[in-house]
Amino acid sequence: MATADHEATGLDCDHAIRRLLRRIDAHIADEPRDSPVRRYLERELGGREGTEADTRLVVHAQINVVRELFERRSDADGLRLLSNIERECC
């Protein structure tokens, strides 16, 4: 269900953020264990026991690192999803 302020766009922010986190997890798993980006994102995004709003804040705070990860992985779909989330959800 989209939040009230995002109903006009049709983007379900909570669902989009869950999709984004799955993409991040997949890319992190492919990064070398000693990758600074991997270690950083595992530390910052590792604990997701909070609410959807908490997760949204964490993603927003790490948006540039996530963008860097997607760029390094040439993930155009991930970058597009990230941009939509940044524009409509954060």
Swiss-Prot record:
Keywords: Nitrogen fixation. GO terms for biological process: nitrogen fixation. The keyword Ribonucleoprotein does not apply. Pfam families: CowN (PF20543). It comes from the Bacteria. InterPro entries: CowN. NCBIfam families: N2Fix_CO_CowN. HAMAP family: CowN. Belongs to the CowN family. Is required to sustain N(2)-dependent growth in the presence of low levels of carbon monoxide (CO). Probably acts by protecting the N(2) fixation ability of the nitrogenase complex, which is inactivated in the presence of CO. This is N(2)-fixation sustaining protein CowN. The lineage of its organism: Bacteria, Pseudomonadati, Pseudomonadota, Gammaproteobacteria, Chromatiales.
